[in-house]
Curated annotation (Swiss-Prot):
Gene source species: Petrotoga mobilis (strain DSM 10674 / SJ95)
GO cellular component: cytoplasm
Principal EC category: hydrolase
Assigned keywords, A-Z: Cytoplasm, Endonuclease, Hydrolase, Metal-binding, Nuclease, Ribosome biogenesis, rRNA processing, Zinc
Gene that encodes it: ybeY
Subcellular location: Cytoplasm
Keyword Secreted: no
Protein name according to UniProt: Endoribonuclease YbeY
Binding note for cofactor: Binds 1 zinc ion.
The family this protein is said to belong to: Belongs to the endoribonuclease YbeY family.
Amino acid sequence: MKINVINQQELREINSKKIKDIAKKVLLNEVGKGNFELNILITDDKSITEFNKYRGKSTPTDVLSFSYGLSEPVIGDIVISVESIEKQAPDFGNSFEEEFYYILIHGLLHIVGYDHENSEEDAKKMFEVQDQYFHQLIKDRRR
């Protein structure tokens, strides 16, 4: 398993080692060991808006996940906007760092097959798992 962190922004310092550690823990737990790569692009609102056009939207978002399948050499790409995270963190009572890792976990779960847009049941399951990882790996209380 190889996790590539590409930092294309200068707004915030990013801890690439911690990003990789969290990603590896979630992926090991969800899919086990594997010979695959995952790319995590850290960017700003302007850049993520360009990626979001793929979804037919012309606005920024906090995270986008592009899953290519767990049997592929590169299982996916995650794009995270530090600007969006910085704006929304106070709304959830999180520091920037806490919100960043919460959103990272969200993106990782999409890569391994979780979804929250198809049904309420799927959404409930995904957010429960996301909260569990957040509680276990980042913050000792639920969001």
